[in-house]
Swiss-Prot record:
Residues 1-2 form a propeptide. This is Aconitate hydratase A. It catalyses: citrate = D-threo-isocitrate; (2S,3R)-3-hydroxybutane-1,2,3-tricarboxylate = 2-methyl-cis-aconitate + H2O. It comes from Deinococcus radiodurans (strain ATCC 13939 / DSM 20539 / JCM 16871 / CCUG 27074 / LMG 4051 / NBRC 15346 / NCIMB 9279 / VKM B-1422 / R1). The gene is acn. Pathway: Carbohydrate metabolism; tricarboxylic acid cycle; isocitrate from oxaloacetate: step 2/2; Organic acid metabolism; propanoate degradation. Monomer. One of its GO terms (biological process) is tricarboxylic acid cycle. Binds 1 [4Fe-4S] cluster per subunit. One of its GO terms (cellular component) is cytosol. [4Fe-4S] cluster binds at residues 441, 507, 510. The lineage of its organism: Bacteria, Thermotogati, Deinococcota, Deinococci, Deinococcales. NCBIfam families: aconitase_1 (TIGR01341), PRK09277.1 (NF006757), PRK12881.1 (NF009520). Its cofactor is [4Fe-4S] cluster.
Length: 906
């Protein structure tokens, strides 16, 4: 076996770049004898180039090249390897990833290996964007004060990352207050084409990546293959392992026509999300094609690509074309780099034009851009799109609808409930907009909707309109370039005047870091037990995510966020009812403050240029003085501190000595959690704040940490003790094993008591009882949060049985040695009469195969046992190895240790 690359098919060729005499090589797909790759989807061509270039007859084989080159619309499910060019991280997922790498180094020393072998082999960039919160808003001091609080709360985490910067090769950090990882990636980090030095010259190849955040797909808008993975999978990639995946189906999404007046990129993204969720694209690539792409700007494409997790696809891919080249120029990329991108993609037959023949796809779907109308999505899921004109009636219907994806099931006697805002005579009712936030890289990367929001604010101020006093407002750009062009356009001042001051450069409200609502507003909500609303330009609106007091959450474009802040409610018809009165007492309607497409374009043309991007990103890694002032610890090994509440050495490698275990049946298991459909990773492992009376809160209180210093679950992901206590602790979790409760509770079947999920798991662990989770459809949807799998594992859960799994979470469960099982033939726990109070035995053969049927013996309280058949969702042979080793990192570490010890013996 060798890890030296081969030159299969003699495909290594010289690339000529016009205007350059630099000698470059590439792996030419057109030299693949016996394969016509001309009509392959472009996304598949990128995978093909990767296996062709990386073929070494070891972890990437000749048959892998043949498999990808022979991709067909009806491919059988065959496993292929993929080696991305780089990895991106954000700090909530990045800190635990670096913790794992540090723990692997400690384990290597303990086992007699060389810790320096644990080192990223490809470029890794971590952008700190998840920690800043909206504590202060609506003032000119909000940005500075929120940044100060961020550093105060996260000092220990940031010291750890500073250590990581010096300890690991190929590891860069973009400091706090720089922007959101996906927007920074789009505007700065992405190159289009990567290169590496070989003996006789430089080899160039497509930029590609994985990221520890599900919205990594935003980069697909620039024609770059990439998607979100769990931290454990990303760590394996950093250490040189391929990602093993089933050959994907590719759904072609044909775009025709052009956008109408008044519609935005957000409206388009919400429509695409709705269509693709209805289509069913989980685990599939979506590739956009058609002449209508020429009527879409690259930021519009990036907005759609960003929401691939919301429509369930692995990617939402747009091929490189002239618009991609224009975007690279507009964002200040070097002309030599742009010329290389053009030459490379044209040479490979990957460059799109309106005349490009349509690729062959697994299936297709079509959308005429002219049909897009202003929209929102909610109140609980991003795929539940609502026409703006119907918003008021749909919300009012939701108040009494059953509690499922769209309803709140209020009785008729509760519909007129009100609450009084303390210290005033102002009353609010159901549908009051208590939070309006321009947030998220999904939209703040798109100048057209940010400029539109600024123009709405300008027109509103000129007419004397003000934001309603119960609305918490915020603007959190995904990059500092946004501030540059809003100020140049003269629009930031108007946003400031109606409360949309910049509160930080990070994810903030979109990920639940919205900060507390003003206490008088909270009291009014509680007084009337109100279903109040948020309107945000984010990408997710799951229950309990945005703010614990806000039950109805709607995704909308930035200009609509501003409009709803002015209206103050979703109950009224915002299209036809007045949203306020001007200084003369005359009614003002939405149409009076809504900008035309021409007004938006004019403002963009005069306020955005490439020099802005160069100014913002030149030296950004050292641009934050507070970051630079943090002292840097030296050394290859991290000095773990037992009293730290942020960073602890996790127990994942404690049992690494010895080889992989044999697959054995799981006997005597009990159900810890039973849930319905659409349970998200945020339900499983919440990222937001927590209270003193939770298991995590009690853990910190016992260690002298005051509640004001708890920070958030997301910021504590470097400490497994806290994260285990926070697993299944979302306040909106509805565990059917603890009826009548909401949050992290279950029934301990050893004694029949309702208790916290953590306390129950501890009791089961002490009694030697393995655990199981029972779930419905789309289990684990949402963020790529690997702690949703890590926490599940640490609670003692050995298996999860679901009707279906979201892609990343299924992979993460296997990566942690937890067995994912799927009901067959449309069966469910309820249809099979499984209540959750039974005991379970999972009959696993020693030679378990991918996607094999296995038997589960279910024994009821009456002692009767029946067998059910489920599918093992370990999908590939490599995943079988991961499961035998107890997880992916254990597999990788054993391999590195074996190789290291072999080198020593040699």
């Amino acid at each position: 076996m060798s890890d030296k690359a081969m030159n299969l098919f003699g495909a290594r060729d010289t690339l000529q770049v016009p205007g350059s005499d630099k000698k470059l090589y590439f792996y030419n797909l057109n030299k693949l004898q016996g394969h016509d790759v001309s009509r392959l989807p472009v996304s598949i061509k990128v995978l093909l180039e990767s296996v062709l270039r990386e073929a070494n007859d070891y972890d990437v084989r000749r048959e892998d090249v043949e498999t990808v080159a022979g991709w067909s619309a009806t491919n059988p499910e065959v496993e292929i390897p993929f080696k991305p060019a780089r990895v991106i991280l954000q700090d909530f997922t990045g800190v635990p990833a670096v913790v794992d790498l540090a723990a692997m180094r400690s384990a290597m020393v303990k086992l007699g290996g060389d810790p320096s072998k644990i080192n990223p082999l490809i470029p890794v960039d971590l952008v700190i964007d998840h920690s800043v919160q909206v504590d202060e808003f609506g003032t000119e001091f909000a940005l500075a004060n929120n940044m100060a609080l961020e550093f105060e709360r996260n000092r220990e985490r940031y010291e750890f990352l500073r250590w990581g910067q010096q300890a690991f090769d190929n590891f860069g950090v973009v400091p706090p207050a720089s922007g959101i990882v996906h927007q920074v990636n789009l505007e700065y980090l992405a190159k289009g084409v990567q290169s590496r030095a070989e003996d006789d010259g430089e080899v160039v190849y497509p930029d590609s990546l994985v990221g520890t955040d599900s919205h990594t797909t935003m980069i697909n808008g620039l024609g770059i293959v990439g998607w979100g993975v769990g931290g454990i999978e990303a760590e394996a990639v950093m250490l040189g392992q391929p990602i093993y995946m089933l050959m994907p189906e590719v759904i072609g999404f044909k775009i025709t026509g052009a956008m109408p007046e008044g519609a935005t990129a957000t409206d388009l993204a919400l429509r695409v999300t709705q269509m693709l969720r209805e289509k069913g694209v989980v685990g599939k690539f979506v590739e956009f094609y058609g002449a209508g792409l020429s009527n879409m700007t690259l930021p519009d494409r990036a907005t759609i690509a960003n929401m691939a997790p919301e429509y369930g696809a692995t990617m939402g891919f747009f091929p490189v074309d002239d618009e991609a080249l224009r975007y690279l120029r507009r964002t200040g990329r070097l002309e030599d780099e742009i010329g290389l991108v053009e030459a490379y993609y044209k040479a490979q037959g990957m460059f799109r034009t309106d005349e490009t023949p349509d690729p062959v796809f697994t299936d297709t779907i079509e959308l005429d851009l002219a049909t897009i109308v202003p929209s929102l999505a909610g109140p609980k899921r991003p795929q539940d799109r609502v026409n703006l004109s119907d918003m008021h009636s749909v919300f009012n219907e939701a108040l009494t609808a059953p509690v499922k994806n769209r309803g709140f099931e209020l009785g008729s006697d509760k519909l007129d409930a009100q609450g009084t805002i303390g210290g005033t005579d102002i009353k609010i009712g159901h549908g009051a907009v208590t939070l309006a936030s321009i947030t998220s890289c999904t939209n703040t990367s798109n100048p057209s909707v940010l400029i539109a929001a600024g123009l709405v604010a300008k027109k509103a101020v000129e007419k004397g309109l003000k934001t309603k006093p119960w609305v918490k407002t915020s603007l959190a750009p995904g990059s500092r370039v946004v501030t540059e062009y809003l100020e140049t356009a003269g629009l930031q001042q108007y946003l400031d005047q109606i409360g949309f001051n910049t509160v930080g450069y990070g994810c903030m409200t979109c990920i639940g870091n919205s900060g507390p609502l003003p206490e008088p507003v909270v009291e009014a909500i509680q007084e009337g037990d109100l279903v109040v609303a948020s309107v945000l330009s984010g990408n997710r609106n799951f229950e309990g995510r945005v703010n614990p007091h806000i039950k109805a959450n709607y995704l909308a474009s930035p200009p609509l966020v501003v409009a709803y802040a002015l209206a103050g409610t979703v109950v009224n018809d915002i299209v036809n009812d007045a949203i306020g009165q001007d200084s003369n007492g005359q009614d003002v309607f939405l149409k009076d403050i809504w900008p035309t497409n021409a007004e938006i374009q004019e403002a963009m043309d005069r306020s955005i240029n490439a020099e802005m991007f160069k100014k913002v990103y030149d030296g950004i890694e050292k641009s934050n003085a507070d970051w630079n002032a943090i002292p840097v610890a030296e050394g290859a090994l991290f000095d773990w501190k037992e009293d730290s509440t942020y960073i602890q050495n996790p127990p994942f490698f404690d049992t690494l000595a010895g080889g992989a275990h044999e697959i054995e049946s799981i006997k005597g298991a009990r159900a810890l959690v039973k849930v319905g459909d659409s349970v998200t990773t945020d339900h499983i492992s919440p990222a937001g704040s927590f209270k003193a009376d939770t298991p995590a809160g009690r853990y910190l209180t016992e260690r002298g940490i005051a509640p004001k210093d708890f920070n958030s679950y997301g910021s504590r992901r470097g400490n497994d003790r806290i994260m285990t206590r926070g697993t299944f602790a979302n306040i909106r979790l509805k565990n059917q094993l603890a009826p009548g409760t909401e949050g992290g509770f279950t029934t301990n079947f050893l004694n029949g008591e309702v208790t916290s999920i953590f306390d129950a798991s501890t009791a089961y662990k002490e009694a030697g009882v393995p655990l199981v989770v029972l779930a419905g459809k789309d289990y684990g949807m949402g963020s790529s949060r690997d702690w949703a799998a890590k926490g599940t594992f640490l609670l003692g859960v050995k298996a999860v049985i679901a009707e279906s799994f979201e892609r990343i979470h299924r992979s993460n469960l296997v990566g942690m040695g937890v067995l994912p099982l799927q009901y067959k033939n449309g069966e469910t726990a309820d249809s099979l009469g499984i209540n959750g109070d039974e005991t379970f035995e999972f009959v696993l053969p020693g030679d378990l195969k991918p996607r094999q049927d296995v038997t589960v013996k279910v024994t009821g309280k009456d002692g009767n046992t029946r067998d059910i058949t489920v599918m093992c969702r370990i999908d590939t042979p490599v995943e079988i190895d991961y499961y035998k080793n107890g997880g992916i990192l254990q597999t990788v570490l054993r391999g590195i240790l074996s190789k290291s010890q072999g080198e020593v013996k040699a």
